[in-house]
A protein has these predicted regions:
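Aromatic (tryptophan-biased) beta-strands that constitute blades/sheets of beta-rich domains
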Residues: 25-39, 64, 71-86, 131-136, ...
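Entry beta-strands of beta-propeller and related beta-repeat scaffolds
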Residues: 49-53, 102-106, 153-157, 202-207, ...
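Short loop/turn segments that connect beta-strands within beta-propeller blades
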Residues: 69-71, 125-128, 173-178, 225-229, ...
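Short glycine/acidic-enriched loop and turn motifs that connect beta-strands
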Residues: 58-61, 110-115, 161-165, 211-216, ...
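Repeated scaffold domains used in trafficking and secretory/extracellular systems
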Residues: 36-46, 87-98, 140-149, 189-199, ...
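Sec-dependent signal peptide cleavage junction
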Residues: 15-27
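Bacterial N-terminal signal peptides
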Residues: 8-16
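A short loop-to-beta-strand structural motif that recurs across blades of beta-propeller domains
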Residues: 62-66, 118-122, 167-171, 219-223, ...
Length: 294
């Protein structure tokens, strides 16, 4: 109880001392400031969300998952040991999103105490209790991950390939936490980088880039999946190659609720995807994945 009281006092001091102004900044700046504050105050692996930051609080005797909104309100605080269990060792926070049906989806990197690295997806109720969990082995070549809720208590999980950057693994979890399907996604002869997974009702819209320097193909791709693993809509836009600019990734603008392409030059600038010219959608491969592929 004493440690929890100390954390509350720290929050009050930070707010009253005006270390940064929450009222005078837009949401993006507030979240950036909040993320900086969390990193300075014993919070590891801070993850940006639409209206909140999730992080691991290491100040107490036991690590806690904490979600704080952009007005410094703590909306979730739960000890990792309450749901990770004793069979695994916590390694890192890989993702955290609010479930559109209520609660939270949290993705952790785990170390099985005697075996290979694992990934754990946990569905938490609004009070932090664990509704279901799915822990599976994580092969090294499947790197960063994206999460999207399906609005029914289930979720989509996207793994990006990091050894050749040409493939993504997509899986869907039912409201009971069962894997309903797994599919690999790739484009013929193109490097595919998925950047954003957004909930669209019960569907997920995946945003990424499909690029080939040799073929002079530089496209953003937008793919909408339903809960049965079917593609229901696609769109491609051409961002070309503009002088010394190059597109590094697609980001989500919280203010406009739209996807933007981030360009890198001597300074950063962005352009809404909607302002890029439409083009033919590239040849896509979507393959059911054998259950032995994790």
């Amino acid at each position: 109880m004493k440690k929890a009281f100390c954390v509350i006092i720290i929050f009050v001091m930070i707010i009253s001392s005006s270390a940064f102004s929450l009222a005078d900044s837009d949401t993006s700046n507030r979240l950036s400031d909040l993320k900086t504050w969390m990193m300075q105050n014993h919070y590891l692996f801070p993850q940006e969300m639409d209206t909140a930051i999730a992080g691991i609080d290491t100040a107490g005797e036991a690590r806690k998952l904490v979600v704080i909104d952009d007005h410094m309100n703590e909306v979730l605080s739960v000890h990792l040991n309450d749901f990770v269990g004793s069979d695994y060792e916590f390694d890192g926070l890989a993702g955290c999103i609010e479930d559109t049906a209520g609660g939270w989806f949290v993705l952790f990197s785990l170390n099985e105490l005697s075996e290979e690295p694992m990934t754990g997806l946990y569905h938490l109720a609004p009070d932090g209790s664990c509704l279901w969990s799915s822990v599976f082995s994580q092969q090294v070549e499947w790197g960063w991950t994206l999460l999207a809720a399906d609005g029914t208590g289930g979720a989509y999980l996207v793994h990006a390939r990091t050894d050749h950057y040409k493939e993504a693994l997509i899986r869907h979890f039912s409201p009971e936490g069962k894997t309903t399907w797994k599919k690999t996604l790739s484009f013929d002869g193109l490097v595919f980088s998925p950047f954003i997974g957004r909930s669209a009702g019960s569907n997920m819209t995946l945003y990424g880039t499909a690029v080939s320097n040799s073929k002079r193909i530089f496209q953003t791709v937008q793919i909408e999946f339903n809960t049965q693993g079917e593609i229901v809509a696609t769109e491609a836009r051409d961002f070309g190659k503009v002088s010394s600019d190059y597109a590094s990734k697609i980001i989500w603008n919280r203010g406009t609720q739209m996807p933007y392409l981030l360009y890198m030059t001597s300074s950063q600038h962005t352009k809404p995807l909607s302002e890029l010219p439409l083009c033919a959608f590239p040849s896509l491969n979507l393959t059911d994945t054998d259950a032995s592929v994790h």
